[in-house]
């Protein structure tokens, strides 16, 4: 029943996954916060159900350690007892992954020290089975943000939607724009690959509108990297001169391995003249374009020490403050002159503060200079998060999603996410739409429902690399309230909920 696939060449990696492990009774492996107790009775993937999957390359390319949210290692002692109280990993903390040979692709975890498989008896963990049965099979639930970029280990290139929008190609040197963003949808224990144009990947490389059973792939772990296997037990890889993503081989080599990387925010800015900021005409940063292309798309890279941002161009150069106070895109990363502070304004606009303390403003020619004072209309820009055509929102309580299949009201404590479609409008406004084709609307009590035929305007305010605020057109922030309530509340930005996206 079991099939262990090995790579042709071992891959050394320091990559660590954050996962949940779901047993046959649909319960999660759980590390309790008291007494370092461990069981299998978690109903949803929350903090206590998170495990860091650490590769152990020296013990084999499918060997891992499991570290709890408390920083303790899951281990099996000489008597077969399962523990999770050691801060340092010993020989009993290594497990070898084998993958079931059926389409489900579930994992069995064999303790290398004992030689037995980890299983669940009722809600208790045991390690006594010489061969894996139903109680020893685990479904892997990735706990990372579901929206990612995908990098091929063999090709050393990123996946992107083709120009015709009908296939995925793996030949991008850098992940630039919305076409390199993919959503991994967890469905029935497996994963579907959802593209930015709202299509699903089939094993033959075609993209279709609905998620058919053949669009589901099981997930495998190989030395910190990912492999995706279809229902016919063949693996996704880039094929041919166009590097089209499809399945072909029934074994794993470097060609079948991928890494999942967080998608860094990429934005466009519109000046007071209604033109997009661009580097199309050279190193001068100028607000003079009518449409968004790669030249008008800028990657925002967070500097944690200062709370400011580096602004990167498609040419791998950075905005910098010149001695003339002009802004040019000709610098390498690292200089303090390349850092800009984003300040969000009550009217939905944003100002950029340069290293000289002045606001960046656009001249009549469109050229950007950092010599403006607060209140100058030329220093206000409208912001668009261009590489997020869809959003998945999460807070400490859970994901944002509908209360139930028959209820349009949104809550923020859901165990699974719902994709939010983003429609960009003028002056930084965006409209948010659900999978039911209805728009988000705000009721008199501030609650949010997906039931409106008319679009309601929202502003996106980027606060951190993976966190944002959502503000209504009248200035109210969408906040997580107690008991999972999702409401438009106070206008004070310091009280606004930071949504992981």
Residue ranges and their predicted role:
Residues 2-501:
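Lectin-like carbohydrate-binding module/patch detector with strong preference for beta-trefoil
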């Amino acid at each position: 029943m079991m099939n262990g696939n090995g790579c042709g060449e071992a891959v050394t990696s320091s990559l660590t996954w954050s996962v949940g492990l779901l047993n046959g009774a649909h319960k999660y492996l759980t590390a309790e916060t008291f007494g370092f107790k461990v069981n299998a009775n978690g109903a949803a993937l929350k903090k206590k159900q998170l495990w860091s999957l650490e590769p152990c390359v020296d013990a084999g390319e499918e060997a891992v350690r499991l570290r709890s949210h408390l920083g303790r290692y899951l281990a099996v002692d000489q008597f077969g007892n399962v523990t999770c109280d050691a801060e340092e990993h010993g020989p009993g903390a290594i497990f070898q992954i084998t993958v079931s040979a059926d389409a489900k692709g579930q994992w069995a975890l064999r303790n290398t020290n004992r030689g037995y498989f980890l299983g669940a008896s009722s809600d208790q963990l045991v390690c006594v089975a010489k061969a894996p049965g139903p109680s020893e099979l685990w479904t892997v639930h990735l706990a990372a943000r579901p929206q990612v970029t995908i990098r091929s280990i063999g090709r050393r290139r990123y996946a992107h939607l083709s120009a015709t929008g009908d296939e995925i190609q793996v030949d991008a040197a850098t992940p630039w724009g919305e076409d390199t963003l993919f959503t991994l949808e967890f469905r029935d224990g497996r994963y579907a690959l959802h593209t930015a144009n709202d299509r699903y990947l089939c094993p033959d490389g075609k993209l279709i509108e609905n998620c058919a059973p053949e669009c589901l792939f099981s997930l495998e772990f190989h030395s910190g990297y990912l492999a995706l296997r279809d229902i016919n037990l063949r693996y996704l890889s880039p094929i041919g001169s166009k590097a089209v993503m499809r399945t072909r081989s029934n074994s794993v080599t470097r060609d079948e391995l991928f890494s999942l990387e967080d998608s860094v925010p990429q934005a466009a800015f519109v000046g007071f003249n209604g033109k997009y900021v661009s580097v199309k005409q050279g190193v001068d940063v100028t607000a003079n374009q009518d449409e968004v292309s790669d030249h008008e798309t800028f990657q925002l890279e967070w500097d944690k020490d200062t709370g400011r941002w580096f602004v990167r161009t498609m040419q791998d150069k950075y905005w910098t403050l010149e001695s003339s106070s002009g802004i040019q895109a000709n610098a390498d990363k690292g200089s303090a002159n390349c850092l800009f502070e984003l300040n969000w304004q009550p009217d939905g606009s944003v100002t950029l503060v340069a290293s000289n303390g002045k606001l960046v403003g656009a001249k009549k020619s469109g050229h950007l200079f950092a010599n403006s004072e607060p209140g100058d209309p030329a220093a206000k820009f409208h912001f668009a998060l261009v590489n997020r055509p869809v959003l998945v929102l999460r807070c400490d309580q859970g994901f944002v999603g509908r209360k139930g299949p028959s209820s349009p009201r949104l809550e923020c404590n859901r165990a699974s996410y719902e994709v939010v479609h983003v429609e960009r409008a003028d002056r930084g406004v965006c409209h948010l739409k659900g999978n039911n084709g209805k728009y988000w609307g705000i009721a008199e009590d501030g609650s949010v429902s997906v039931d409106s035929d008319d679009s309601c305007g929202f502003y996106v305010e980027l606060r951190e690399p993976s966190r944002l605020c959502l503000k209504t057109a009248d200035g109210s922030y969408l906040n997580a309230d107690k008991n999972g309530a999702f409401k438009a509340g106070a206008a004070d930005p310091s009280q606004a909920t930071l949504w992981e996206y």
